[in-house]
Amino acid sequence: VTYSVEVIGVQTGFPFGSYTYGWRLGPHIYDTPPMIGILWLMTLMGAMYWSHKWVGDKDTPKARLAKAAVTATLMVALDIILEPVATQAGFWTWEGDHIPIKNYIAWWVIAFGLALAWRKVHSLRTNRAAGLLFLIQAAFFIGLLLLPWKS
């Protein structure tokens, strides 16, 4: 699902805005590196781990919505950190060299929907390792964001 959304995004500009992938994430299929779908999945699993920790074990409709909202918010927070680094590193390029606000809105909506869907499929679990990986990703991109870049 995540890879399909990225392919649609690259081909149409919807829902994130107009962007193209560089070659640093590996080979492309339909102008999109398959690795990006895996990165989405890893990030989603980590954000879901933390949302479960913070919201709790309740399985009520309200708790499920809260967990999905926290997951989506964590995903967007990571994307806010990741975007400037990824564009500077040549992972992808935005049309007009600016990150459109609709990118962050789309990330939130998609992550919210995926988090809700994920929790309906009980065979798909997230765990502490996913949560740790999320923190490592965040620390990695924060570190890179704070470093000076040569133009």
Across the structure, where does each feature detected by a protein language model lie?
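Aromatic-rich, lipid-facing transmembrane alpha helices and their immediate juxtamembrane interface loops
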Residues: 1-151
